[in-house]
């Protein structure tokens, strides 16, 4: 008998990307609306994707 293989969560699959070194990239939060109250610097910096923290990555491993 083989071990059960769990499916990857589809919602997560659409939101993250794993780099070649195994780190996880994701987009910034708080970008969809209410942007007029944020500074230009906040809006500009949130365009780029960022790497996930190690503490979050440990929780995320179960979903991948």
Curated annotation (Swiss-Prot):
One of its GO terms (cellular component) is cytosolic large ribosomal subunit. GO terms for molecular function: structural constituent of ribosome. Residues 22-31 have a biased composition (Basic residues). Coiled coil: none annotated. Residues 22-64 are annotated as: Disordered. Transmembrane segments: none annotated. This is Large ribosomal subunit protein bL35.
